[in-house]
Amino acid sequence: MFYTTVGKIIKELNLECLTEISGIEERKIKDMNLNRPALQLMGFFEYFDEQRVQIIGISEMAYLKTMTPSQRRDAIERLFQRNIPCVIITSNQEPFEEFLEFSKKYGVPLLRTQEVTTRFMTNLSTFLTHELAPRITRHGTLVNVYGEGVLMLGESGVGKSETALELVKRGHILVADDAVEIRKVSEKTLVGEAPEIIRHLIEIRGIGILDVKNLFGVGCVKESERIDLVIQLETWKQGKEYERLGLHDQYIEILGIKVPTLVIPVRPGRNLAIIVEVAAMNNRQKKMGYNAAKALTERLQKQMSRGNGAE
């Protein structure tokens, strides 16, 4: 199971740590869902998921103010007794002393943000969705071409990196080369990025490692990109039938999501960069509802119908 840590969300979301607890930065978060513990402060813990980050907003704090000191103490202790990853107070509110006391007693990090509850929960949810999403690493190259995320797959040496370099020269954006980390961030969306150690780098045989960001500028690189199209490059195989009309869409399944795919044969003289550009534009056009192959078929059928009618 994938996880992130309290230390990462402190750094990413600029949180203030209100209590000093050993090992706080390594404390694991395994659930991308969040919880506002209104019912739990009332004493109802049925169906309570202890793995979720607990958010104390203005409403929860206002409810605690209506309690007597002994009721408030019991309510806060019941929450901290659970094996929760952390408690975050929003809107820069001052915590009750009981929050600080039981945070230290039970070793549960107590954090605070200046952001309002709704905005903070949106930002934290987005971060956790990315960090905890199912993922795999594929050997390939990911580029942004006319706004379409194109993942190029194929055997080593088939020309993925060279094609990506030519695309960058033509004004497109490199996301990842050689290794692409693919995350399933929703039931319909895959996002790819480069491992941090090789981010913005590209390998060209005969030259070596190139830093695309330094060579071409920050506008030519991107940290992550949605995967809209998969292009599988392969050496041209004599006698193999390749798609010539494009009537029947093909798909590849990655992490349970079907992504449109094309098989592009590679041989000397073919300009792969232009082919990838056109493939990206054509894929975008299909998503907008137009398919050139189907339009041609319809025109042919109409012409044949007119011809049969004339007879």
Curated annotation (Swiss-Prot):
The keyword Zinc does not apply. Residues 202-211 are annotated as: Important for the catalytic mechanism of both phosphorylation and dephosphorylation. Keywords: ATP-binding, Carbohydrate metabolism, Kinase, Magnesium, Metal-binding, Multifunctional enzyme, Nucleotide-binding, Serine/threonine-protein kinase, Transferase. It catalyses: [HPr protein]-L-serine + ATP = [HPr protein]-O-phospho-L-serine + ADP + H(+); [HPr protein]-O-phospho-L-serine + phosphate + H(+) = [HPr protein]-L-serine + diphosphate. Its cofactor is Mg(2+). The active site is at H139, K160, D178, R244. Belongs to the HPrK/P family. Both phosphorylation and phosphorolysis are carried out by the same active site and suggest a common mechanism for both reactions. Homohexamer. This is HPr kinase/phosphorylase. It comes from Caldicellulosiruptor bescii (strain ATCC BAA-1888 / DSM 6725 / KCTC 15123 / Z-1320) (Anaerocellum thermophilum).
